[in-house]
A protein has these predicted regions:
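Membrane-proximal helix-turn-helix segments that form the acceptor-binding/catalytic region
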Residues: 205-216, 230, 248, 253-274, ...
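Conserved donor-binding/catalytic core segment of Leloir-type glycosyltransferases
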Residues: 273, 315-343, 349-354, 367
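Nucleotide-activated donor-binding/catalytic signature segment of Leloir-type glycosyltransferases, i.e.
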Residues: 376-396, 411
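Donor nucleotide-sugar binding/catalytic pocket of nucleotide-sugar-dependent glycosyltransferases
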Residues: 249, 263, 267-314, 323, ...
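Active-site proximal beta-strand in glycosyltransferases
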Residues: 30-32, 220-225, 233-252, 271-273
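A charged, aromatic-enriched C-terminal amphipathic alpha-helix characteristic of glycosyltransferases
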Residues: 477-509
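Short hydrophobic beta-strand element within catalytic cores of glycosyltransferases
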Residues: 432, 436-441
Length: 520
């Protein structure tokens, strides 16, 4: 069985493909050159020194890996062109690739030509817009700059969409894309629903041209997160599995281009994989019949306690630099809002301040990662609470380094938003490393899919988080017992082999159903 996995948010496509290959499925993972760095396989499995900008992935060929990692030959960049696999040698990387796609220009145009100059200028402006969009606490000057860039972005989007849809000043590349649009309108899930694709609609779906070509080479496509939208452009005879990754809660019900397309893709997929148990209500609202809960697979061999049980060099250095006896790790992004995907990291900081203020507690340090929209607000809150000396900031850490920090800390704090009550990879990885995890966990939303609840130390409010910190800090035996139970639970319910076999079962059923339909 040869399958394609695309939409590598948090390396899900890469990990599922890797584990499926261990079971004999010829699984291939696809991602984008400009993708957020946490969607690159190197971020998951390579070890390297230094820190990188998560929003500007490097040319990995220039990075020296200290653990001998080599990119597997079953991992591919998706070009975003009708030929899905290889970008032209002279095509730009990073943000400039998106600009090239948005303008429908050809990468082979003269270096000094107006097309190249416009691409370069818009690439700079686009990068600035994106950097400002990632910050909630903008200065007045930054806010004005952001709004001006947003208006310019809308103007360029409208102009290019108008030109493309009406085939004005066509380039060879644009003519190929128009033909691909026509193919979608001739036969696809979108066409069978009575709708048609236009270039302005397709422009909202980056890399859309690659998916029909990819489908010719694989028996099944599994599309992750919002990439499931591209399933709407595939013919109905292509087996399709949609992988939910916090993308079924609200997006399919929004009256937007992406919302409507994702709604259609979920409803016409052969199967939907749910990773967040709370979205079962959304699956029912969509009228889905073939959905299945499969948790994020965890490689329990990689995410494990220190092999020899000895103090790690990281732990030794952190304790010496802070004078702390205990280390609390919170690697999640800084997001204070009440949006469904918020982490409410402000509650972690305030709870830790309460912990520090109690002199009966063992001295502790809080390790945070500097990423998320509210980093500036978190820095200010830490200063206002007077706990700067007890907080250690680290850049976003690749997973091998993060695993080493798990092995060096006493417990992990994750997310504390009342509207979710489920966990993602941070909690699962920490549990696998035999660490107690404090987060908000709602057992009720898991009852339909989990026969046994994890030993998560649930908390929601600042007071509850402080209480969990206190209980675990004052009782080393309890920390050890909770950690051991946590690892046992992960191995039983989240282990890589169990999850991979579930995916394999879904794929087999989807392909068999198509073969049965074609034989009738």
């Amino acid at each position: 069985m040869k399958t394609a996995h695309s939409g590598n948010i948090a390396n899900n496509a890469y990990l599922v493909a890797k584990f499926l290959r261990r079971l004999g499925e010829d699984a291939h993972a696809f991602h984008f050159r400009h993708e957020f760095i946490m969607g690159h396989p190197e971020w998951e499995d390579a070890d390297f020194e230094g820190s990188l900008d998560p929003f500007d992935p490097p040319d990995w060929r220039t990075i020296s890996f200290t653990n001998g990692f080599a990119r597997p030959d079953w991992v591919h960049y998706l070009s975003g062109q009708v030929d899905p696999y290889v970008l032209p040698a002279d095509a730009p990387a990073g943000a400039a690739t998106r600009v090239m796609a948005a303008l429908y220009t050809d990468s082979g145009s003269p270096a000094g030509g107006i097309g190249a100059q416009v691409r370069a200028a818009l690439g700079v402006l686009g990068a600035r817009y994106n950097s400002l969009a990632r910050v909630n606490q903008l200065s007045l000057r930054e806010a004005i700059e952001f709004n001006v860039l947003a208006l310019a972005r809308l103007a360029v989007e409208w102009a290019t969409g108008f030109r493309a849809e009406r085939a004005i000043l066509t380039t060879p590349r644009l003519r190929v894309l128009l033909a691909e649009r026509d193919a979608i309108n001739a036969t696809s899930r979108l066409q069978e629903s009575g709708q048609r694709a236009t270039m302005p609609i397709l422009a909202k779906c980056p890399f859309w041209p690659s998916y029909r070509g990819m489908a010719l080479d694989y028996e099944l496509l599994q599309l992750y997160g919002v990439e499931a939208i591209k399933g709407a452009f595939l013919p109905t005879n292509v087996p399709l599995v949609a992988f939910e990754h916090s993308t079924m809660r609200t997006l399919p019900f929004e009256n937007t281009i992406q919302g409507r397309l994702l709604n259609l893709a979920y409803r016409t997929a052969d199967a939907c994989v749910i990773t967040n148990p709370d979205v079962v209500s959304s699956a029912k609202r969509l009228g889905l019949r073939n959905y299945r809960f499969i948790p994020h697979p965890i490689d329990e061999l990689k995410y494990s306690p220190p092999p020899d049980g000895a103090e790690t060099a990281i732990r030794r250095e952190l304790r010496q630099s802070t004078g702390a006896e205990l280390l609390f790790l919170c690697p999640t992004r800084h997001e204070w809002s009440n949006a469904f995907d918020s982490k409410r990291s402000d509650r972690v900081i305030r709870a830790f301040s309460r912990y520090v203020a109690d002199s009966s507690h063992p001295k502790a340090a809080l390790v945070l990662c500097r990423w998320g929209r509210d980093v500036r607000a978190s820095e200010q809150l830490i200063a206002d609470l007077g706990i700067v000396a007890s907080v250690v900031w680290k850049p976003p850490m690749h997973k091998t380094r993060l695993r080493d920090f798990y092995r060096s800390c006493d417990l992990v704090l994750d997310q504390f938003h009342e509207s979710v009550g489920t966990f993602g990879t941070v909690t699962a990885e920490a549990l696998s490393c035999a660490l107690p995890v404090i987060m908000y966990f709602n057992p009720k939303v898991h009852e339909w899919c989990l026969p046994e609840m994890p030993p998560i130390q649930s908390a929601l409010t600042e007071e509850e988080i402080t209480a969990r910190l206190s209980e675990l800090a004052l009782d080393p035996a309890r920390r050890l017992a909770v950690g051991e139970a946590s690892r046992a639970w992960i191995i039983k319910w989240h282990g890589w082999e169990r999850c991979a076999r579930d995916h394999l079962s879904v794929h087999t059923q989807a392909i068999d159903s198509h073969q049965g339909s074609s034989s009738r």
